[in-house]
């Protein structure tokens, strides 16, 4: 397992199994506009976050991936094929939906904010994850890699990866924590039905962190033949940039749709954050628009005061996990702590380095809501809008209870409805069954 390390000095040593890696922390940019204009740096840094903390055996593969992505984005044939498949296979563009009854629920005497949903739950496979999986599968084909591995927590990234592998005839192995397999049995069956091998991970807490560690071990062993489709804006460079750029279609569409719907930019963007891919996909095209507030909502689990949570930005400290420097949940010795969330997709003790950076420079805000708040929000949205959101997405909806009373009348709020809740029905039934 890659260890988390507390940083109290300007030089860091990360110990991988038998592989010492050193890195000097870069200084922070002074100018706020400069700080957001070029992300990441040529070294894969978002300020002091990001980088490549991996065994030497992976460095050529990361360099190959970075070069392949750079060339692909400049190739009209690649972008045309990606756009074609996003339309015809994934079902993009996803609509921007005015949630009239949810808006009315939070209405005050002066009118209150207006709430819009970016409907990523309507994508093929039921979540935003297919955007990145499709893009990386096309890159793997360009690199001649025929074997694909992935990690998954809630199972949505695993399903998306298995889906694109079936589409292109690629071998697929998905690593998934045994506890998450129990919680997400439907998605496990979907992956196997699509022809993927689902490899249970029983180490540690048997959740997303441990699945990611096992996927990295596989990649180290089989790097010549295998491409790792990492599912979030985490991991070593170029993954945080690569995954962000494939998901940026979310924010690009939302920007145009807002102009068509109400004639200007939104005032607030709201999204759940585990590793942070759906949030970054929505945020990225708006980062340089200072009038747009960007709010990420983490999982407070049983409450941040209990220690049983996954509120990494809210409660974390700087360290290294899974090849990148970011904020992590750690103990006093720098060991990565167990995370907890009712949502398997948010049950992760780290976060993408760009989120850590945007928080540090004050460009984005981050909050946390509990399991119970997420359940209450899931039920509310289901009853008011006829849309059952994923438990991950429900965390973003839950923050409306705190946010809406603070917003001026006429404020336009866009929530990334990142996934549908079919996969969570059993979990929700266990928690709410006696209340329905």
Swiss-Prot record:
InterPro entries xref list: Trp_synth_b_CS (IPR006653), Trp_synth_beta (IPR006654), Trp_synth_beta/beta-like (IPR023026), TrpB-like_PALP (IPR001926), TrpB-like_PALP_sf (IPR036052)
N6-(pyridoxal phosphate)lysine, modified sites: 129
Family to which the UniProt record says this protein belongs: Belongs to the TrpB family.
NCBIfam families named in the record: trpB
Cofactor: pyridoxal 5'-phosphate
Pfam family, one: PALP
Organism, as annotated: Prochlorococcus marinus (strain MIT 9313)
SUPFAM superfamilies hit by this protein: Tryptophan synthase beta subunit-like PLP-dependent enzymes (SSF53686)
Role noted for this protein: The beta subunit is responsible for the synthesis of L-tryptophan from indole and L-serine.
Record field: transmembrane: none
Enzyme's top EC category: lyase
Taxonomy of the source species: Bacteria, Bacillati, Cyanobacteriota, Cyanophyceae, Synechococcales
Name of the protein: Tryptophan synthase beta chain
Catalyzed reactions: (1S,2R)-1-C-(indol-3-yl)glycerol 3-phosphate + L-serine = D-glyceraldehyde 3-phosphate + L-tryptophan + H2O
Subunit description: Tetramer of two alpha and two beta chains.
GO molecular function: tryptophan synthase activity
Taxonomy, superkingdom: Bacteria
Keywords for this protein: Amino-acid biosynthesis, Aromatic amino acid biosynthesis, Lyase, Pyridoxal phosphate, Tryptophan biosynthesis
Pathway the protein acts in: Amino-acid biosynthesis; L-tryptophan biosynthesis; L-tryptophan from chorismate: step 5/5
GO CC terms: cytoplasm
Annotated EC: 4.2.1.20
HAMAP family for this protein: Trp_synth_beta
């Amino acid at each position: 397992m890659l260890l988390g390390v507390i940083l109290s000095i300007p030089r860091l040593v990360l110990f991988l199994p038998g592989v010492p890696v050193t890195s000097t922390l870069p200084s922070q940019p002074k100018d706020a506009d400069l700080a957001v204009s070029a992300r990441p740096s040529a070294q894969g840094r978002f300020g002091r976050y990001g980088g490549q903390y991996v065994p030497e055996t992976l460095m050529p593969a990361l360099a190959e991936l970075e070069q392949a992505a750079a060339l692909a984005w400049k190739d009209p044939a690649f972008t045309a094929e990606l756009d074609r498949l996003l339309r015809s296979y994934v079902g993009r563009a996803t609509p921007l939906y005015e949630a009239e009854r949810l808006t009315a629920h939070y209405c005050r005497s002066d009118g209150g904010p207006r709430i819009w949903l970016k409907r990523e739950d309507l994508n093929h496979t039921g979540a935003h994850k297919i955007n990145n999986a499709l893009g990386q599968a096309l890159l793997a084909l360009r690199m001649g890699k025929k074997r694909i591995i992935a990690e998954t927590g809630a199972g949505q990234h695993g399903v998306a990866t298995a889906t694109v592998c079936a589409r292109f005839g690629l071998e697929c192995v998905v690593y998934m924590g045994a506890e998450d397999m129990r919680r997400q049995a439907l998605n496990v069956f979907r992956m196997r039905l699509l022809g993927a091998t689902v490899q249970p991970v029983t180490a540690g807490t048997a959740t997303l962190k441990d699945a990611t560690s096992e996927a990295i071990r596989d990649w180290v062993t089989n790097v010549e033949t295998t491409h790792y489709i990492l599912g979030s804006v985490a991991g070593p460079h170029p993954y945080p940039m690569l995954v962000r750029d494939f998901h940026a279609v979310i924010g690009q569409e939302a920007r145009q749709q807002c102009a068509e719907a109400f004639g200007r930019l939104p005032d607030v963007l709201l999204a759940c954050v585990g590793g942070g891919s759906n949030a970054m996909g929505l945020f990225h095209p708006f980062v340089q628009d200072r009038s747009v507030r960007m709010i990420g909502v983490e999982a407070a689990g049983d409450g941040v005061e209990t220690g049983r949570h996954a509120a990494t930005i809210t409660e974390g400290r700087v360290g290294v996990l899974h090849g990148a420097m970011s904020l992590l949940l750690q103990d006093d010795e720098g060991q990565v702590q167990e995370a907890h969330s009712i949502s398997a997709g948010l049950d992760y003790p780290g976060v993408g380095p760009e989120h850590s950076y945007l928080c540090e420079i004050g460009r984005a805000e981050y909050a946390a809501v509990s399991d119970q708040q997420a359940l209450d929000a899931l039920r509310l949205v289901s009853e008011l809008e006829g849309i059952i959101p994923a438990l991950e997405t429900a965390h973003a909806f839950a923050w409306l209870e705190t946010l809406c009373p603070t917003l001026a009348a006429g404020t336009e709020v866009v929530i990334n409805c990142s996934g549908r809740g079919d996969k969570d029905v059993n979990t929700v039934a266990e928690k709410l069954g006696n209340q329905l």
